[in-house]
Amino acid sequence: MGKRVVNALMVGAGEYTTGSVFTAAGAAPDKPAGVVAITFTDLKRRGRINDMYLADAVGTRMPAVRDTMRTKIAEKYKGMEFVNAIKTFPNDDVAFDAEAYKLAIAQCSPGDVVTIFTPDDTHFDIAKACMEAKLHVLVAKPAVKTLDKHLELIQVAKENNVLCCVEYHKRFDPLYTDARDRGDSLGPFSFFNATMTQPKAQLDTFKNWAGKSSDISYYLNSHHIDICAWIAGKSSRPTKVTAFAAMGAANKYLNVSDRKIEDTITLTTEWENKVDGSKGIGIYTASWIAPKSDSHTQQNFHYCGQNGEIRVNQARRGYEMAMDDEQRPFANLNPLYMKYTPGKDGYFSGQNGYGYRSIERFVEVCQQMNDGKITKEDVENMGDLATIESSARVTAILEAGRLSLDNSSRGVELVYDKSAPFESEPTALRLF
C-alpha cells in the first residue's frame, strides 16, 4: 500500500451520508445536509482524500441524491464543488441492485477507505466484501446484529490486515471524551443509566426496516452501550442482559399491522469488575415515539463508579435559539456535533464537530497505516476509535437484548472463554 492519498467510497446514499430523505419531514434538524459526504468533500478540499464514490441499491434516486448534495453542499459553501464530481453507482436507470456496491469497490485500490451507512442487516456482506478487497472500513453502528457475525468480521479484518471500525461518533464529543478520561478516578464500575429518544418522524425515515430487520435498541442504545463500555474499560465486563419493551404507538403512527414495532426498549445489564468480582449495573433506554421538541435527540447519561459519578445532558448544552419560525420556533443547539452554518468567509467551518472528527480521524489513521507509520495494534492502543476487535461486547449486549425480547424477557448470559484473559470479548450467548 504505497504512500498516496486515499480514495473514499460511501455505501448508502441516505440521510447520514448525503442528507437525502424523501419523506414529508425531510432530513433530521441535527444533520440537514448529512454527515459523511460533506465531511469527505471538505477533506478533499483540504487535500486529505482523492476521488470519491457513492453506491446505493436504488439507481433511480441518484439524480435526486446528486441534486440534494449540490444544493446542500456545493451551492452553500465555497470550495465544495468537488461534491458534484462524486461518481455514483449503479446507473440512474437501475431500479434496484443490492450488490451495486461491488461495482464501486472495483473502482477502489487497496488501502482506500469505505463508509457503510445502510440498513443494519446489510452491513456484514458489504463490510466483508470491502475488507476482502483490502479496503479499510468504517461501518455505522451497530456493526452487525449478532455476535457470530461480529467475530467473523474480526477474522476477515485480521486475514486482510485492514482496519475495520464502528462509527461511534459520540466518542469524539469533548464531554464524553473527558468523561472517559476521568473514568479511572471514579473507581470500579457501579452504575450507568442512559436515555435516548427521538421524535416519531424518524419512523417515516426508517419505516422500511423498523420492526423487520432491526429495532430502536440497535439504532440508539448502541451509542451509550459503547460509551459505558468505553468509560468502564476492560477492567469490567458485561455478563447478563434482560430486555423490556413498550409497544403500541409506533404501529399506530405508521398504520402497519404486518409486524410489531417496539416503541421503547430498555436493556438491563449486569457487569463484573476484575479487581474484586464486584457487580455493576447498566441500564440503556431508547425510544422513537417522542414528540417534536427543542432538541432532535433527547439524551443523557449518569455514570457512577464506586468512588464518584459523572452526569452528562447532551441535549442541553446551554446554547438556545428562538426565532419567528412556526416549524421550529425554539431550539437547543448543538454545533459540537455538526456545524452547518458557514463561516464568515463562506467556507464550511464544522471541522471541530464530533460527527466530522469521527470520520476525519478514521481517514487519518488509515493513511498512517498505509504509509507504514502505525499498525492496527497502535490504533487499538490509542483507544479513540471503536475497532471491530474491541467492540464485540457492544454487539453481544444488543443481540442479547433482542434474544431476551423474543423470549418473553428471559435473561441472557454472555459467555467468555474461561482460558482467555478477563479483558477478552464474549464468545457466545446463552438463555437462562
What does each model-found stretch correspond to?
Residues 134, 140-142:
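Short helix/strand-capping hinge loops at secondary-structure junctions
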Residues 139-140, 164-166, 312:
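Hydrophobic residues in well-ordered beta-strands that form the structural core
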Residues 50, 54, 372-394:
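Glycine- and charged-residue-rich phosphate/anionic-cofactor binding loop of Rossmann-like
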Residues 14-17, 24, 163-165, 170-262, ...:
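Predominantly a Rossmann-like dinucleotide-binding segment in NAD(P)-dependent oxidoreductases
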Residues 2-133, 151, 155-159:
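N-terminal glycine-/serine-/threonine-rich beta1-alpha1-beta2 phosphate-ribose binding loop
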Residues 4, 204, 219-326, 355-376, ...:
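Contiguous beta-strand/loop segments that form the cofactor/metal-binding neighborhood of enzyme cores
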Residues 16, 143-145:
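Short, acidic/turn-prone active-site loops that include or flank metal/cofactor-
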Residues 115-116, 139, 194:
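Redox-cofactor binding/interface segments in oxidoreductases and associated redox assembly factors
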